[in-house]
Structures are given as C-alpha cells and as structure tokens.
C-alpha cells in the first residue's frame, strides 16, 4: 500500500506548494497526483470497487485517501471493508499503515456504526483490549499483556 501513501503525499505536496505560493511546483505535483491515481485505479481497483489487496488496510487507505473514482467503486469498497470488519469480529486487522485511518474511512463514508463498533471492541487485537487489561498508555504490541495478566515475552 506504499502506492496509496505516495499518492496521498503527492496530493498534500501539491496543496502545500500552492499554499506557499509555489504555483509551478504545485501544478507539477497535481499532475503527478493525477497520473499516480489513474495508475492506482487501473492496476488495483475493479469496476465495482474490489481491490487486488483484499484487506482492511487496502480498503481503508483507498477510501480515506479518495483513491476511488466512481460512486460504485466507493460503495463497493465500503461494503467490502464492512464485510472484512464483520469477518474479523470487529477486531483491528490492519498494520501500521491502515490502523490510523480505518475508523476515519468508516466515519467519512457514512458508516459511523462500524467505526464505533471497532472502537468499542475489547477482544485482542483492539483499541480497548489494552484498556481492559489496565493499560494507561499505548502499548508497543496489541497483546503486550496476556489475558492471564502475564507479560507477553514475544517471539
């Protein structure tokens, strides 16, 4: 999903350049954004919004970063993300790339109930699992403490 982040950052660079008066650079980044987005859609997205990487992360990034072109693709991607969330019992199934955006992807696409359901999940891996285990800070791992109260030694 590095491509998704590249496209997102290129769009941000375009806006930043325009904001500071670098119109020529802004136009260049805007053109690069268009080319990269078109490539992304042709390579990774089907007509009905399915992505070649069928994961929570892929759909969350595509929705959050506005990488889908048609309402049909957006609706299809959202439905697939909802299905993947249900399949995973609303536990977080993203890595570092998708975790910061998955709740926004739901909320910004009128699926706020899914965002709240994922946020309220207490089974590992979830945002509330560490809280249910007494955490007062962010853990390095979802399961730093095991259900029996022992520290996870890792592997």
What are these regions (language model features)?
Residues 1-155:
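Active-site core of glycosidic bond-cleaving carbohydrate-active enzymes
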């Amino acid at each position: 999903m590095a491509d998704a982040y590249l496209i997102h950052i290129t769009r941000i660079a375009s806006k930043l350049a325009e904001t500071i008066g670098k119109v020529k650079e802004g136009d260049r980044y805007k053109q690069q954004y268009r080319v990269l987005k078109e490539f992304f859609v042709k390579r990774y997205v089907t007509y009905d919004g399915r992505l070649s990487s069928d994961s929570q992360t892929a759909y969350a990034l595509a929705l959050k970063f506005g990488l889908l072109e048609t309402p049909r693709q957006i609706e299809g991607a959202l439905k697939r993300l909802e299905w993947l969330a249900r399949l995973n019992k609303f536990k977080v199934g993203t890595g570092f790339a998708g975790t910061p955006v998955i709740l926004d992807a739901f909320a910004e696409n009128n699926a706020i109930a899914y965002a709240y359901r994922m946020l309220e999940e207490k089974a590992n891996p979830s945002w509330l699992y560490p809280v249910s285990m007494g955490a007062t800070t962010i853990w390095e791992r979802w399961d730093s403490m095991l259900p029996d109260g022992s520290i996870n030694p890792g592997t």
